[in-house]
């Protein structure tokens, strides 16, 4: 997409602005770069972003994870707003003009458009959804380089037919249209690899109430190669699916407005009623079965082994990476040695010193910071294994200087994790209580962070699942066997950034609920100020490290064992 095409469009249509989202057709959090309009236009990558494009300027909106990175990237070329402080709606209303604008109807959800439009209309601001493009655009990933697999029976929690029947039994209409790729993958025990760092098929799913074949909505011919799919489903492209619904005389179906794009909704609304479903598939995914938990714990052994070897190699200078990007490549190569490793679960965040204060920093291959004279490394990484998905953040001391500020903050971040792991919470609490609990503790020591405290994690699926979200505004209810991250941090712009992240499973215990840590990577004791650590906390850290050593010992070479015992157990 070229800026002159947008300017010409605004002039020809006599409108004031064009709103650019960062979505793909299925509204995925992390679309492929070649499907992201913001990236194609500006070469800036983020998982959440919007651009208001005017003829004489553009305004960039993102969340706190990317504001610092955006300021460094765009410099003074545009205005940048943190969405938690100024929304797109806020900005447009502040202009005090009767503005009109447009957006691509295929790249915004029904829910988001309705919220946007209802508030803007009250202020006499009109936004027109566009159903035809004014420039050439590719909406689909490259299916030719993809492959698709049906999950092995020994790993799946339920047969796909049982999943479909559960949905059918809760339908209030003639059928449900599921547009979220992660939901399709999970319900059908299906994985596909056309989306980078993901395992989701780029497909929708229609489940009819009556006993006729469900429909997979996809352009991916690889799906036909899966026998259960070719036998049990019709596979239609989007246009053919819409025609099918019309010919079949469906009158009332349901969907999630949060996940369906506006274009599909408008096309279907011409001949049927499309209501908001009450079926919460995200919540369905968020509660793991005992089999899933066991599988996920298995993949964390593989992942812990890879990350541990990487950390020891880095500390012992057994590897000599040139820069931040090469550091992440070394870790990736360690993970590739793991049993049933498939791919990364997201682009690694590998950041030295002041770059670590950029919350979602992505190291460029050539221009990232060199390894010379650095003091700390923050590395946030994860992987997709056949048994599950991982996500972990550790901070590693790589220099010789002793920064009291860093040790102080790191120690209290570690103490906050120990505190939350030992707390007996009530059952069925809102996830926001965990967020409040850890923030209240850290605020006593003047440690704050602007991002959420955690997110759900998939089972060989999305690294960021929609349920549960651990944040101050979340209404999600925690039950037994939820899987999510807890990742408090502390960031000082221009100096350093710290974050510690583990994955936890909720477990009913003694009439309440506790968090079980399933991450198997030790903390860097060189960053711990033991003067601030209680005797209980010291023993807790030691037991955690001993547990890791016991699980990984048989697969460690002697030099790794010696380092672990000397520096990660006996030092405590």
Q: Where do the model's predicted regions map?
A:
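Active-site neighborhoods and metal-handling regions in enzymes and metal-associated proteins
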Residues: 1-572
